[in-house]
Each structure stands twice: as C-alpha cells, then as structure tokens.
Amino acid sequence: MASRMGFEPGFLVLESGYGDDSDAALRQDIIHVTGSQFISGHVQEVVDAVLLWWRDDDGDLVDALVDVLAYLTDGGPIWVLTPKVGRRNHVEPSDIQDAAPTAGLSQTSTLSVAADWSATRLVARKASKR
C-alpha cells in the first residue's frame, strides 16, 4: 500500500496524530518502503510527505494541516488518515473537503488503506497564473 500511496525509498515522513488505534501494518509498510523511521514531534527539517492520523474528536483540522504544511517540501503530499464509516471517531469526507482549501490545499484522491482506515491525499494548491 505504501508504494501505491507514492512513498519511495529515502523519503522522510512526518507522522502526526499517532494513537493506539493507528494501523500498525500500514505504518510498517511505509517504514519498509522508505527505509526510514517516522519523524514526529518538533521537526527541524523539511519532509517529503506527512502522515496525519485524524479522528472526529481531534480538534480543528485546518490548524493541524497548517501546522504540518510548514515542514513539507514543495509538491509533497499530506495523507489524512481517518476511521472508515461506521468506525469510532469517523470523520465525514466533507470535513476534509472544507478544511483543505482553507489550509491552502487541494484534495486529489482517497484510498482504502487498511481495514479501519481511509487515506485522503492533499497537496498544496498551485498559484494561479496571471
């Protein structure tokens, strides 16, 4: 699944929102493909991608997106991982659709990445040409 999500060897990945309910197999697959452990906490470097585990009771999604966007390389994706429909703390897709443009992001795709988790890919919007 990590390769399908666009992760490549050598990628530095910032992980935010990790919890006991996060999917261990997906995390291990990403670590295996990239060859690197996740970066978390206070970041001092630019990362190639962000993995943001997000649940309905986690607070303001716009704030979380803006926070992680500061560390992301140009063109790098933010993968917002949310519990699937019917799972505890499910996030409505419209919540992501509403938050993304406010944070300066565009939604590009959504994948089923684990039994309990969906992943929505967000990227920075391109500046409009004049």
Language-model regions: role of each:
Residues M1-R130:
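S-adenosyl-L-methionine-dependent methyltransferase catalytic core, i.e., the SAM/SAH-binding region
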